[in-house]
Amino acid sequence: MAGAIASRMSFSSLKRKQPKTFTVRIVTMDAEMEFNCEMKWKGKDLFDLVCRTLGLRETWFFGLQYTIKDTVAWLKMDKKVLDHDVSKEEPVTFHFLAKFYPENAEEELVQEITQHLFFLQVKKQILDEKVYCPPEASVLLASYAVQAKYGDYDPSVHKRGFLAQEELLPKRVINLYQMTPEMWEERITAWYAEHRGRARDEAEMEYLKIAQDLEMYGVNYFTIRNKKGTELLLGVDALGLHIYDPENRLTPKISFPWNEIRNISYSDKEFTIKPLDKKIDVFKFNSSKLRVNKLILQLCIGNHDLFMRRRKADSLEVQQMKAQAREEKARKQMERQRLAREKQMREEAERTRDELERRLLQMKEEATMANEALMRSEETADLLAEKAQITEEEAKLLAQKAAEAEQEMQRIKATAIRTEEEKRLMEQKVLEAEVLALKMAEESERRAKEADQLKQDLQEAREAERRAKQKLLEIATKPTYPPMNPIPPPLPPDIPSFDIIADSLSFDFKDTDMKRLSMEIEKEKVEYMEKSKHLQEQLNELKTEIEALKLKERETALDVLHSESSDRGGPSSKHNTIKKLTLQSAKSRVAFFEEL
């Protein structure tokens, strides 16, 4: 009895000690999170918690991924988390990733967080070379990635070498050309500078719009065998099922769009596809593992559901999300316009300030020069006045000497000289006196003229001094800065106002705003068509420019296939490729698959 009681107590003690929660680590493309989950939680409980934490509403694109023996698997929504074949060592790790891809990113991805997560995932796939990207397109995509990270190009900030530590191009592309990192940076920056004015979300969307036309974008590949045992690749994506040659993942041999497929099932390793047309025989293939068949079926069901959903009217939830996204986009656009106006006004004010500072410096230099000129004029005037005084005194002295000489001459003439010798001597003295008097008169006249000239120079110097003082006075009294209005001008009446109350944001729309936005969207469509043509021309130009630097011996098999496709004038997009492949009847395509 005592033993039974002790056994029951031990069992209940053990039961109480069992943990009620377990730790889960969620790894997104740019962050890690940890949660405490209840033991009974199903996949949907954990998935919903992650989506709420991220603020993500477009949940149908994403899933929680884990790995089983080198095979990718996804958490099932209706199954307990711990019932999956996952490591029981805590924290249990899952990767939050896009499981399904949109046909048209711009039309289908509504939330900014959704766009951002797709951008990060696709960028990593391209850099890790899981998605093939031609070299010229890699440079363009890199320029949009730089715009998304750094904002508008500013030569004073983004100086040479600012991309040195960034991973922007696949290593395959870098190794394919005889180009230095500086040469790659120069070409990326040239395109980066053209993206001025694009916000982060716009740059990321442009990245996705280009990436979605890459042949391997959004395709999950699986090794299969047909009835004849031929090894092939099955590609599952948003458009349908595609069959590839194992050596060529770029262009499928045949395709089956989702609207032609009625049923998909598997038994053990055998997979069965039933076409919509019941007259057409089913076609089967075998995969390598049962676990792979489960993954293929999951991807087929999810992609098929999304394919059909896109071709129906949007649900109320999606309509609300799109309306909110349009409003948010309009609000951000107006906010960017306001910031652009403020930036322009600030730049104009800075330019005005710089101009005024330059003018002030110039006026200070002019004032300094005027002061120096005034000082020189005053010194010159003093010297001229002193020289004029000396000259005047010398002239007076010479005049006095001339008068004395005249008096001496008159006295000599009046003296009676009785002898011829005395007369001759006297005449000689008279002659000398006359010559001396004449020289004195000429010197006196010259000194008088010099005195007059000095007086004239003195007057001119005083006039220059007066003008210098007048100019200095003008500089001193001139206003340095024009009156500045410290209050920025009010926004135009057609710009809606923003009222922030506590943590909420109120935004009032007017009909004119939505009409203007609609007109802008239509205008953007036309501009996009023109830009696409211009973009293709730029890509071709860059391709031609760097072609001479290509090292042919380093080309991969995919590089060769892409070059051959381009030389043959290959299709411009994946959609065109699939469209051409489905021109034949489904029956003939099934037969072709069986004969591969």
UniProtKB/Swiss-Prot annotation:
Phosphoprotein listed as a keyword: yes
GO molecular function, one term: actin binding
Coiled coil (residue ranges): none
Gene Ontology terms: cellular component: adherens junction; apical part of cell; cell body; cleavage furrow; cortical actin cytoskeleton; cytoplasm; cytoskeleton; cytosol
Phenotype caused by lack of the gene: Mice are born with abnormally small lenses with serious structural defects. Failure of lens vesicle separation and the resulting changes in cell organization causes lenses to herniate, leading to expulsion of lens fiber cells through a perforation in the cornea. Developing lenses show loss of cell apical-basal polarity, failure of the lens vesicle to separate from the surface ectoderm, failure to properly exit the cell cycle during fiber cell differentiation and incomplete terminal differentiation of fiber cells.
Segments of this protein annotated with the region Disordered: 560-580
The entry's keywords: Cell membrane, Cell projection, Cytoplasm, Cytoskeleton, Membrane, Nucleus, Phosphoprotein, Tumor suppressor, Ubl conjugation
Post-translational modification, as annotated: Phosphorylation of Ser-518 inhibits nuclear localization by disrupting the intramolecular association of the FERM domain with the C-terminal tail. The dephosphorylation of Ser-518 favors the interaction with NOP53.
PTM annotation (Phosphoserine): residues: S13, S518
Membrane topology: Peripheral membrane protein
Keyword tRNA-binding among UniProt keywords: no
Start and end residues of each FERM domain: 22-311
GO biological process: actin cytoskeleton organization; brain development; cell-cell junction organization; ectoderm development; hippocampus development; lens fiber cell differentiation; MAPK cascade; mesoderm formation
Its job: Probable regulator of the Hippo/SWH (Sav/Wts/Hpo) signaling pathway, a signaling pathway that plays a pivotal role in tumor suppression by restricting proliferation and promoting apoptosis. Along with WWC1 can synergistically induce the phosphorylation of LATS1 and LATS2 and can probably function in the regulation of the Hippo/SWH (Sav/Wts/Hpo) signaling pathway. May act as a membrane stabilizing protein. May inhibit PI3 kinase by binding to AGAP2 and impairing its stimulating activity.
Complex and partners: Interacts with NHERF1, HGS and AGAP2. Interacts with SGSM3. Interacts (via FERM domain) with MPP1. Interacts with LAYN. Interacts with WWC1. Interacts with the CUL4A-RBX1-DDB1-VprBP/DCAF1 E3 ubiquitin-protein ligase complex. The unphosphorylated form interacts (via FERM domain) with VPRBP/DCAF1. Interacts (via FERM domain) with NOP53; the interaction is direct. Interacts with SCHIP1; the interaction is direct.
Protein name listed in UniProt: Merlin
Organism: Mus musculus (Mouse)
Classification of source organism: Eukaryota, Metazoa, Chordata, Craniata, Vertebrata
